Amino acid sequence: MDAIKKKMQMLKLDKENALDRAEQAEADKKAAEERSKQLEDELVALQKKLKGTEDELDKYSESLKDAQEKLELADKKATDAESEVASLNRRIQLVEEELDRAQERLATALQKLEEAEKAADESERGMKVIENRAQKDEEKMEIQEIQLKEAKHIAEEADRKYEEVARKLVIIEGDLERAEERAELSESKCAELEEELKTVTNNLKSLEAQAEKYSQKEDKYEEEIKVLTDKLKEAETRAEFAERSVTKLEKSIDDLEDELYAQKLKYKAISEELDHALNDMTSI
C-alpha cells in the first residue's frame, strides 16, 4: 500500500511537471507568435522603407523562418506535453483502479480473517465442551467399570454359592437315598415283625417306635430339601439378575464407546475445518 501511494505521488508530481512544461511551452508559443507578428510588422515597415535592400529582406526572412520553426517546435512541445499529460492521466486512473481493487481484496481478506478467527473461537469452545464431555464419559466409564467388577464379583459369588448348594444337595440326596433304603429295610422288617406279632409284641413296639423315628427323619429331610431348594432358586434368581446387570453395563459401555467415537470424529472434522481456515488465511 505504501509503495502504491508513493508511486501515485510520483505520478502526480510528474503530471504537475508536465503541466508546468506545457504552460511554459504555451507561453513560448505566445511569445513566438508575438515575436513573429512583431517581425512581420517590422518586415512590412522595412519593405516599405527598404524596398531595394535585398540583404536586409533575406535577413528578416531568415529571422521569420527561425521564428516559424520555433513556433512549430513550440507547437510540437505543447502537443507532446498534452499527450504526456493524457498518458499520465490514464496511468493515474489505472493506478487508482488497481488501488481500489487492492483495497477490495484487502477488505475481503480481513473479512475472511475475522470469520476464520470466529470459527477458531467456536471450534475452541466446541473442543472444550467435547473435552469436558469426554472427561465426564471417562469418569462415568470408570464408575461403570467398578459396577461391572462388583456385578461380576456378585455373579461369581452367586455361582460359588450355587455350586456349594448343589454340592450340599447331592450330599442330602445321598442321605435321602440311604434313608429311603433304611426305610425300605424297616418296612421289610416290619412285615417280618407283623408275621411274628403274636410272638414278639415287645419287639413290634420297638420296631414301630423305630419306624416313627424314621418317619420323623424323613419329614425333617424333606423340610431341609425344601429349604435348600428355595435357597437354590434364590441363588439362581440372583445369578440371573447379576447376568442382566452385566448385560446392561456392557451395553452402556458399548453406547459410551460409540458416543466417544462419534465425538472423536466430530472433533477431527472441526480440526480439519480449522486447518482449512488457517490455510486460507495463510494463502491470503
Curated annotation (Swiss-Prot):
Pfam family, one: Tropomyosin
Region of interest (Disordered), residue spans: 1-38
PTM sites of type N-acetylmethionine: M1
Lineage: Eukaryota, Metazoa, Chordata, Craniata, Vertebrata
Assembly: Homodimer. Heterodimer of an alpha (TPM1, TPM3 or TPM4) and a beta (TPM2) chain. Interacts with HRG (via the HRR domain); the interaction contributes to the antiangiogenic properties of the histidine/proline-rich region (HRR) of HRG.
UniProt keyword annotations, A-Z: Acetylation, Actin-binding, Coiled coil, Cytoplasm, Cytoskeleton, Muscle protein
CC annotations in GO: actin cytoskeleton; actin filament; cytoplasm; plasma membrane
Family: Belongs to the tropomyosin family.
Domain notes: The molecule is in a coiled coil structure that is formed by 2 polypeptide chains. The sequence exhibits a prominent seven-residues periodicity.
Subcellular location: Cytoplasm, Cytoskeleton
Basic and acidic residues: compositionally biased ranges: 12-38
GO molecular function: actin filament binding; cytoskeletal protein binding; identical protein binding; protein heterodimerization activity; protein homodimerization activity
Highest taxon of the lineage: Eukaryota
GO biological process: one example: actin filament organization
Function: Binds to actin filaments in muscle and non-muscle cells. Plays a central role, in association with the troponin complex, in the calcium dependent regulation of vertebrate striated muscle contraction. Smooth muscle contraction is regulated by interaction with caldesmon. In non-muscle cells is implicated in stabilizing cytoskeleton actin filaments.
Gene expressing this chain: TPM1
Chain segments annotated as coiled-coil in the UniProt record: 1-284
PROSITE patterns for this protein: TROPOMYOSIN
Protein known as: Tropomyosin alpha-1 chain
